Amino acid sequence: WRKVFNEYNPPAFAVAEAWVNPDRQHLYASTEELGQVFNFEFAKKDWIRDDMHLAIEEGLESAERSGSSATWVMSNHDVPRHASRYGLPQVPASSHHQLAKDWLLRDGTTYEENRELGAKRARAAILMELALPGSTYIYQGEELGLPEVADIPWDELEDPTAFNSVREQIEKGRDGCRVPLPWVAADAPKLDDPDDEFGHD
C-alpha cells in the first residue's frame, strides 16, 4: 500500500482499523505504513476524567511515536453509542466496555440508562474531541447525539455477528447503532425559493 500511496503528491494515507493497545498503534500509523490508525481508547472509556485524560495522553504519545497525526473516535459500529454508554452507571474503565455490551445484550434492561445525562456527556465529549489536535472521526448519528437502540428483538436483527451467536445469544451485533436516522416530516422545508441561498424563513 505504501508504494501506491507514495505515488501521490503529497503522499496519500489510509486509516487502519486495528483494535490494539496504544503502544502498538505506531506499527500501523507510521508514514512508512498506512499513515493513521483509529484510536479507539475513548470508545472503551467511561465518562471518568482520569480515564479520558489517560486516553488523550496515550493518543498523543502514539501519534508522536509514529510521526502521524493523532486520531479520536468516540463511537463506531463495534460499541454501543457513547450517548447511551455515558448514561449507564459508572464503573472502572477496565469493565466499562463489558458493562455496555451486557446492557445491549439484555435489551437495555440490566442497567437504567439516564438518557438526559448521557446526551449531556456525549455533547461535552464531542466538543472535547473536536478541540484536540489531529483527526476526529465522527460515526453517523453522533452529530445528532443519537442513543443506541438496545431493544431490537433477536428475530429482527440483521447483523451477521448476531446471526452467528443467536443460539447462545452472546453477541447482539451492531444493528442498534445502524437503525434509520430519526426523521419528522410534519414541518415543511424552510426554503421559500430553493434556488436562492438567501430565501430562508
Where are these regions (language model features)?
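Active-site and adjacent substrate-binding regions of carbohydrate-active enzymes
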Residues: 1-201
